[in-house]
């Protein structure tokens, strides 16, 4: 199955395993549009029995009422999200005790303030007891908004300018970043990290979702294939979501042709270039042009299926580690 796990991701995982200590806090940023598939089993072992906050970022692209970024409506949406999905999540999580869930839109200060308060609670207790340094590691898949969340936290806490580089394509942060102070007068620091993709894709549909939300670099899958999947999902929701581009259709070629003609995004000589227009449609999706919706099915059955796959993967990895040790 298609995945994207370049060397720097493997190195990051190893460096994190070596550097995260018992007192540190893990902030795992996931994409609210794929709350289930952006779980990364590779991070489960890293965060096991440590204080962890799971942040569902980009709620504005997942929940309709957060779309206009109006403060109260965005917050209500986050609350609704927690009440419905997070309950389901908590029921199925394997290590429940140490983690909390927060939904965010990285440029809505109220969402960030809630996260900041939670981090204050989690880090101050250790800091007060010993005055030792506490690190907050911001981890997650590529392009989920780790750097944006970090910048927003630092701005809300210290009114400081941006420290982490933000980019619209995945793989912008390539190294475990320098530590930056989070709270005035406290030895509490944040660490930005490169996005880590799942070493193994659990379900074929996940790869298409990662490409769609841009967690995976464009070009790993054909853009037209990804748009075909988007079209399928839009048709399930309501074909009126794309009337500005095309009349209702199940056929991706017709859709792309109509979209190219409607938008004037044509290739050389005024012909339709499927890849060009598909790439444009993907950009539109990523800005919320088709509305806000969650791509993962949150049915209990899906959760069970997913957890079974994750458990199998963990067992397979354990067996591999055992046999390597025996050989050595
Ligand atoms: N709509 C929306 N976009 C966001 C949000 N947070 C971040 N973004 C955008 O998502 C893109 C990626 O943000 P980054 O903060 O660079 O993501 P990252 O996880 O640090 O990325 P890598 O370094 O590639 O792993 C940027 O274009 C941001 O502007 C959000 O809450 N909503």
From Swiss-Prot:
Gene: mtg1
Chief place of localization: mitochondrion
Locations listed in the record: Mitochondrion inner membrane
Record carries keyword Transmembrane: no
Family matches, as Pfam families: MMR_HSR1 (PF01926)
Transmembrane portions of the chain: none
Domain CP-type G: 10-199
Superkingdom of the organism of origin: Eukaryota
A single BP term in Gene Ontology: mitochondrial translation
Protein name: Mitochondrial GTPase 1
Gene Ontology CC annotations of this record: mitochondrial inner membrane; mitochondrion
Residues that hold GTP according to the record: 57-60, 143-148, 195
Function text: Mitochondrial GTPase involved in assembly of the large ribosomal subunit. Plays a role in expression of the mitochondrial translational machinery.
UniProt entry keywords in alphabetical sequence: GTP-binding, Membrane, Mitochondrion, Mitochondrion inner membrane, Nucleotide-binding, Transit peptide
Native source organism of the sequence: Schizosaccharomyces japonicus (strain yFS275 / FY16936) (Fission yeast)
An example molecular function term from Gene Ontology annotations: GTPase activity
Family assignment from sequence similarity: Belongs to the TRAFAC class YlqF/YawG GTPase family. MTG1 subfamily.
């Amino acid at each position: 199955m298609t995945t994207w796990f370049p060397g720097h991701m493997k190195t990051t995982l190893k460096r994190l395993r070596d550097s995260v200590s018992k007192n540190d806090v893990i902030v795992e940023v996931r994409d609210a549009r794929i709350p289930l598939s952006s779980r990364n089993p590779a991070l489960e072992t890293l965060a096991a029995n440590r204080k962890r906050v799971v942040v569902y970022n980009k709620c504005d692209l997942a929940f309709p009422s957060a779309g206009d970024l109006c403060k109260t409506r965005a917050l209500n949406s986050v609350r609704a999200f927690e009440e419905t999905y997070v309950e389901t999540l908590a029921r199925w999580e394997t290590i429940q005790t140490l983690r909390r869930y927060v939904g965010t839109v990285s440029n809505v200060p109220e969402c960030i303030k809630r996260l900041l308060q939670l981090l204050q609670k989690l880090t101050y207790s250790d800091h007060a007891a010993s005055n030792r340094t506490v690190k907050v590691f911001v981890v997650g898949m590529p392009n989920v908004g780790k750097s944006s969340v970090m910048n927003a936290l630092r701005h809300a806490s210290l009114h400081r300018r941006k420290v982490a580089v933000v980019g619209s394509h995945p793989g912008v942060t390539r190294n475990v970043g320098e530590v930056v102070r989070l709270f005035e007068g406290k030895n509490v620091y944040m660490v930005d990290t490169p996005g880590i993709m799942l070493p193994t894709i659990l379900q074929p549909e996940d790869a298409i979702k990662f490409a769609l939300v841009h967690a995976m670099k464009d070009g790993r899958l054909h853009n037209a294939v990804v748009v075909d999947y988007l079209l399928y999902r839009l048709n399930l929701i309501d074909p009126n979501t794309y009337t500005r581009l095309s009349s209702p259709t199940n056929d991706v070629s017709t859709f792309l042709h109509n979209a190219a003609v409607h938008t004037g995004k044509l290739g050389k000589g005024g012909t339709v270039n499927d890849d060009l227009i598909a790439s444009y449609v993907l950009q539109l999706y990523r800005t919320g042009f088709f509305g806000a919706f969650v791509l993962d099915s949150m049915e209990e059955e899906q959760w069970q299926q997913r957890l079974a796959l994750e458990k199998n993967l963990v067992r397979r990895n354990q067996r591999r580690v055992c046999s390597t040790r025996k050989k050595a």
